[in-house]
Regions:
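Active-site His/Glu-centered metal-binding helix of metallohydrolases
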Residues: 50-58, 315
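Helix N-cap motif at beta-to-alpha junctions
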Residues: 147-150, 245-250
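Non-catalytic beta-strand/loop surface segments
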Residues: 1-42, 66-149, 183-238, 262-306, ...
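Solvent-exposed, non-transmembrane alpha-helical starts
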Residues: 43-45, 152-154, 171, 306-309
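Catalytic Zn2+-binding segment of zinc metalloproteases
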Residues: 56-66
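A common structural junction motif
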Residues: 160-168, 260-267
C-alpha cells in the first residue's frame, strides 16, 4: 500500500490464506497472530458460545500433540462425544444427571492418555510470551510473541495445531468457560451492551446471542457441532496470518507455504440475515446492576465498508480521544461528569455509534 508507514507486505497463498508481514528489527522477536474470520455471530442457535469455548479447546492438542496413546484415547473420546449428544437431547433431568456422571467417568479415564498442557509447554520452551487468544463477534485470533530464531518451529507447531484439534479434557475446560460466563453476569457493562444490541438488531445474532453464550447452552454442549464448526470455518481461505518483527519476509513466505500451503480450501457458507426493523422512535431500556448509574446512547448504521461505517471511528474520535475530543475538553477536563466516552462498533452487517 503506498505511503504505508508499517510497510506491510501482503501475500495470498494458493489455498487462499492471507499473509501480512511487517519487518521491525528493533528487537530480535516476532509478534504473531493467526486470525479466523468466524465468531459468535456464526454460533449455531442451539449451541451459543461455541466459537468461544472452541477457542479454548484449540490449546488442547491434536491426535499427535498432547496424547500418550492416541488409539486408546480416541476410543474413549468417541464415546464421550456420543454421550454429550444424548445428554443434550435428553429432557429427563435424572437421566441427564446419569449421562453426565458417565461422561465424567470416561473423561477421567481418557485423561490417563492425555499429555496435559503440551502446547503451552512447547511454546514456553521456545521462549514465547503473551500466548493467548480471543473470540469476538466476527473473529477469533490466536496470539504469540516468539524469539526470532524460533520462527520455523512456531510455524511447525501452529500448522499442527490447526490441522485437526482434539476435544480432550473438554468438560473440565467447559467448567472454566461457564465460570467466565457467571462472572460476566455481574458486570454492568456487559448487561448494557447486551440490552443495546437487542434494541439495535433484535432479530440478528448481534442482538440475539453473545460471545459467551447462554447458560443453558453451555450446560448442553455439542462436540459434534464443534467439529462441524471447525470443518466449516477453520479453513485457509477464511484465515489470515500476521507477523511483525525481526524476520526475513521471503523466508517467512516459504515457511508459510511449507507448513500451511497443504491445507485444503473450502467454500465458506454465505451468512444470511433478515432486514432489521426501522428505528423510528426512541427506545429506552433500564438495566439494573451494582455500579453507579450511567446513561448510554446508541445509533445503528450500515455495516463495514459503507461510507457511514468508515466515518464512525472518525466521529467517535472527534468526540473522545483521551486528550482533545469534545468530551475530553468540555466534560471530563471541566469536571462536569465522572466519565464520558464515545466509540464505534463496526461489524460486517451493521455498525453503531455509542455515547457513554
Amino acid at each position: 500500500v503506498p505511503h504505508d508507514p508499517m510497510q506491510v507486505l501482503q501475500h495470498t497463498l494458493p489455498n487462499g490464506m492471507r499473509l501480512f508481514f511487517s519487518v521491525n528489527k528493533e528487537v530480535p522477536r516476532v509478534y504473531t497472530e493467526i486470525a479466523v474470520r468466524v465468531g459468535s455471530k456464526h454460533d449455531p442457535a442451539e449451541t451459543t458460545g461455541l466459537a468461544h469455548y472452541f477457542e479454548h479447546m484449540m490449546f488442547k492438542g491434536t491426535d499427535r500433540l498432547g496424547t500418550l496413546d492416541w488409539n486408546k484415547e480416541k476410543a474413549i473420546l468417541d464415546q464421550i462425544e456420543q454421550l454429550f449428544e444424548q445428554h443434550r437431547a435428553e429432557t429427563d433431568l435424572a437421566v441427564k444427571k446419569t449421562l453426565y456422571a458417565e461422561i465424567d467417568r470416561l473423561s477421567s479415564e481418557a485423561a490417563r492418555f492425555a499429555a496435559a498442557n503440551e502446547y503451552d509447554k512447547l511454546v514456553s520452551a521456545m521462549g514465547a510470551k503473551g500466548t493467548n487468544a480471543y473470540t469476538w463477534v466476527e473473529q477469533t485470533v490466536y496470539l504469540n510473541d516468539i524469539p526470532a530464531n524460533e520462527l520455523e518451529r512456531w510455524f511447525q507447531l501452529e500448522s499442527e495445531r490447526f490441522r485437526r484439534p482434539v476435544l480432550r479434557l473438554f468438560h473440565t475446560e467447559l467448567e472454566t468457560v461457564f465460570e467466565e460466563y457467571n462472572i460476566s453476569q455481574d458486570r454492568d457493562f456487559r448487561k448494557v451492551m447486551k440490552a443495546g444490541q437487542e434494541v439495535l438488531t433484535p432479530t440478528h445474532p448481534y442482538g440475539t446471542q453473545t460471545t459467551l453464550g447462554r447458560g443453558e447452552d453451555l450446560k448442553n454442549p455439542s462436540q459434534t457441532n464443534i467439529y462441524r464448526f471447525f470443518d466449516t470455518y477453520y479453513v485457509p481461505n477464511n484465515m489470515g496470518m500476521v507477523l511483525c518483527g525481526d524476520f526475513d519476509p521471503q523466508e517467512a513466505l516459504k515457511l508459510a507455504q511449507q507448513y500451511f500451503g497443504g491445507f485444503a480450501p473450502k467454500p465458506i457458507p454465505a451468512f444470511h440475515f433478515d432486514p432489521q426493523p426501522q428505528l423510528t422512535l426512541r427506545e429506552r431500556r433500564d438495566v439494573y446492576g451494582n455500579e453507579a448509574p450511567w446513561v448510554e446512547l446508541a445509533w445503528r448504521f450500515p455495516g463495514a465498508g459503507t461510507p457511514e461505517a468508515r466515518m464512525l471511528p472518525l466521529l467517535a474520535g472527534m468526540l473522545f480521544n483521551y486528550q482533545a475530543g469534545l468530551f475530553d475538553l468540555n466534560l471530563i477536563q471541566n469536571q462536569q461528569v465522572l466519565e464520558a466516552y464515545a466509540y464505534a462498533r463496526v461489524y460486517e452487517d451493521f455498525s453503531s455509534l455509542v455515547l457513554h
